[in-house]
Amino acid sequence: IRNKYGFYKKLFVVDLFCHGTAEPFYFRDYLELIDGKVRKIDFRGQSKHERSNFQFVITSDNGILEESFEENIFTKAYAESLIMKKSCFSCKLSENIHVSDITLGDFEWPDRAQERNVRVLHPSIISVNTEYGTKIFDNIKNNLYISDIVTEDEVAFYYRSHSEKGAWGYNIAEKEKFEEDYKKWGFKEAVYRNLFQHEINYLEKIYKYMQ
């Protein structure tokens, strides 16, 4: 924005700590598995459990599907890198190159936030990147529960290369395998084969044993 329009005193730039973006056509494939016409989708539904994370909630003509991110096959496939866009794996803005005034994101360790007296159900992380961002933050910080991040593992979690093999959400090898399976079997079977292959193998052994 600044490269195109220049600097304005009232222009305040915010970006996000991003874990990557899923391919839209995979989401369309997933929605086709839902029974009934989909009326509403909420990726950040409130969990019934106090210490739990957000819920993935879909409202359709036939009822409400409510699952944790670990239970739902779409969000779990996203977390395991299977359905991310290829461009996410070469994104330079995932490292320590943030040109915004402030960067926002979900803080991944609610228990650690509680230990630091940040007593909210869904804590956020805020990175102040510029002098202008500091001025804005100083004007609002008295209305927030704040604790400085001092541990190296927490900082490294948010500033890292998406090309790192095996890092959460950025495993290109897993994505490439899923793409090949998707061509063979379609979305549903490819997801189950990649997320639950160990369980499938175990059930197949039981089935053979019972024959």
PLM feature spans:
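Short beta->alpha junction loops/turns
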Residues: 19-20, 129
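Long, compositionally biased charged/polar accessory segments in the mid-to-C-terminal portions
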Residues: 36-211
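Short, well-ordered amphipathic alpha-helices
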Residues: 1-2, 28
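Oxidoreductase and adenylate-handling cofactor-binding alpha/beta cores
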Residues: 33
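Short, charged, surface-exposed secondary-structure boundary motifs
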Residues: 20-30
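Active-site adenylate/phosphate-handling loop in enzymes that bind or generate adenylated species
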Residues: 16-17, 110
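A short alpha->loop->secondary-structure connector
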Residues: 3-16
